[in-house]
């Protein structure tokens, strides 16, 4: 991944497939815009990286439908519980499904000061619209490390290959 095209809180070691370097860089740039907008607490700028009909599922399970809903909710959050936070997003991989669709997996979290352990896993479904990559769907899941450890101890084959 090209670290120069991302903010310093988007340090990834992921891999893209299929020799799609320009598309990979464009997707990384969109996610850097997302991180930057979050850091500024700018809900309007945050919303510009989503499609008009995007869906957004928070780690709490809340489902937001459409850019306007995503912007309104983040405006409220940036003014309250998320005020002054920053967003860390470490890209794990980018996979392409045709010329205009990609799925991005990442680890991330919100933080104040310096980022700590990234406790959430995200999946972004990206689409190219009018030559620009945008987020069409976002899913955020909080990892439960204790339950993962218990599962892996009792069922070692359940551990993801990347973590073996």
Each language-model region and where it sits:
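Short, surface-exposed beta-strand-loop junctions and turns on beta-sheet-rich folds
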Residues: 64, 110-111, 141-142
């Amino acid at each position: 991944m090209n670290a120069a095209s991302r903010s310093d809180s988007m340090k990834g070691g992921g891999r893209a497939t299929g020799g799609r370097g320009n598309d990979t860089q464009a997707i990384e740039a969109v996610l850097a815009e997302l991180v930057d907008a979050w850091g500024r607490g700018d809900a309007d700028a945050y919303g510009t990286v989503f499609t008009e009909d995007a869906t957004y599922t928070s780690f709490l399970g809340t489902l937001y439908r459409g850019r306007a809903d995503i912007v309104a909710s983040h405006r409220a959050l940036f003014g309250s519980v998320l005020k002054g936070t920053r967003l860390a997003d470490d890209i794990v991989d980018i996979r392409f499904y045709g010329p205009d669709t990609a799925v991005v997996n990442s680890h991330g979290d919100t933080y104040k000061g310096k980022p700590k352990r990234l406790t959430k896993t995200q999946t972004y479904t990206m689409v190219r619209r009018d030559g620009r990559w945008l987020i069409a769907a976002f899913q955020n899941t909080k990892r439960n490390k204790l339950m993962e450890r218990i599962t892996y101890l009792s069922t070692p084959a359940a551990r993801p290959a990347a973590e073996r």
